[in-house]
Amino acid sequence: MSMFLAPIHFMVYGKNQLQEQLIAEIAKRAAAEGWAEASALDAYCSREDRPLDAIIDVSNIHGWLSKSIADVEHRLAALVTELLFGHPERLAVLEELAYEVGREQAAPADAGAGELFQYLTTHLVDGMPCDGVNMMRDQTAETFRWDKTADVHSHYWTEVEGSPTVYQALRSRFVAGILSSTDYEVSTADGISFVLQKA
């Protein structure tokens, strides 16, 4: 395992921080809507905003980042599941929040399919890079196809008695927000094989 911080480690941390932003926005909206007390919602949010090199255990970089991913994934699942319990209609509000957080990170409007795929991979939490979750199948100038080789998200949701389909709905809207500045969209028929192409 690496004993030195590299750009890929900062990328992983950046993806985690972006998901932290989504959690914070959901908690903020939930408090404003009166869905829960702000003090209770705070338990799902992290106040850590220091740069990676100021907080990471450099003697265990891989382990520290893996734990950080698990933590942010678990808190998102727990928060959303709690808010939707008995109130499935709230999902539409959360989906719109996910879209807006994604839109704030909008991809370059002139990017091609391959560039957009790479952009998405630097913004979406998908386990550690060594997990190799997304495997390219083929690519053209205007199309990028890949397969998801492992499901690294669902267990966080089932552990809190939530629905993995809720996560997929939020992720889909988040991705749509990122791509909102482009002519592209991501589609899938089975949740395993994906295609990024012009709408």
Regions found by a protein language model. Name each.
Residues 1-141:
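N-terminal accessory segment detector
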